[in-house]
């Protein structure tokens, strides 16, 4: 159980998962979202996991930012309903999918994006690093290198998708795209500043900082029967 320092917390179920195929995680998110649309009283959720190598595009993404032929089928590519341009997921990148009812917090998408950034910035502070925001962009940077990408979808004020923090990934996959459509700002990973860092150790701090920023009490849980990976 992880509590924020604030009283009167909302409960939030924490699903700490390992390596999960992207489409399984996406289907799981949709299931959790739909349940909460039909029953808004259900507890919020934070999923933490990693993905096998996969490229995802937001619903309005420009395929010009992809440097390979999607039709060749050489790489796993999926277009989904989040905002933002193309991004890359792989082992060593910690992905967070909050399923939150923003009516419990603030019905403001800009506020929500800044809160997700704040979670990452606080995690970096734990390691003595100063995360930065860049005006007009969403995400978190370290010394000019983007270490966290954020893309969300909200339906009836309930969120899905979320953030991806580059902890210790193989960065070669990013060379095949223009990450997030930003050509003049390189991507980076925490391992460049903290050799030997792992997703396993970062998970705790991400959960802790998430609880603090959103004022929730995290209850570590396991997926129920409705989630059966295909």
Swiss-Prot record:
The keyword Nucleotide-binding is assigned to this record: no
Xref: CDD domains: LipB (cd16444)
Pfam families linked to this entry: LplA-B_cat
Annotated site location: Lowers pKa of active site Cys: 146
Gene3D superfamilies xrefs: Bira Bifunctional Protein, Domain 2
Stretches assigned to coiled coil: none
Keywords: Acyltransferase, Cytoplasm, Transferase
Family according to the record: Belongs to the LipB family.
More info: In the reaction, the free carboxyl group of octanoic acid is attached via an amide linkage to the epsilon-amino group of a specific lysine residue of lipoyl domains of lipoate-dependent enzymes.
Protein's UniProt name: Octanoyltransferase
Species per Swiss-Prot/TrEMBL record: Nostoc punctiforme (strain ATCC 29133 / PCC 73102)
Species classification: Bacteria, Bacillati, Cyanobacteriota, Cyanophyceae, Nostocales
Encoding gene per record: lipB
């Amino acid at each position: 159980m992880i509590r924020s320092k604030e009283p009167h917390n909302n409960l939030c179920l924490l699903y700490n998962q390992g390596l999960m195929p992207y489409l399984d995680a996406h289907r799981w998110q949709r299931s959790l979202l739909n349940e909460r649309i039909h029953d808004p009283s259900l507890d919020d959720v934070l999923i933490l996991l990693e993905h096998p190598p996969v490229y995802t595009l937001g619903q309005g993404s420009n395929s010009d930012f992809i440097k390979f032929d999607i039709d060749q089928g050489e790489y796993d590519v999926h277009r989904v309903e989040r905002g933002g341009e193309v991004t890359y997921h792989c082992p060593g990148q910690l992905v967070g999918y909050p399923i939150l009812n923003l009516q419990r917090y603030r019905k403001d998408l800009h506020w929500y994006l800044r809160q997700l950034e704040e979670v990452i910035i606080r995690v970096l502070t734990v390691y003595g690093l100063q995360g930065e925001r860049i005006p007009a962009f969403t995400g978190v940077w370290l010394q000019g290198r983007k270490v966290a990408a954020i893309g969300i979808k909200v339906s009836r004020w309930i969120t899905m998708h979320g953030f991806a923090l580059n902890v210790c990934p193989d960065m070669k996959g990013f060379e095949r795209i223009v990450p997030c459509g930003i050509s003049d700002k390189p991507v980076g990973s925490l391992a460049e500043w903290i050799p030997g860092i792992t997703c396993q150790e970062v998970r705790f701090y991400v959960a802790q900082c998430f609880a603090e920023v959103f004022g929730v009490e995290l209850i570590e849980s396991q997926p129920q029967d409705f989630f059966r990976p295909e």
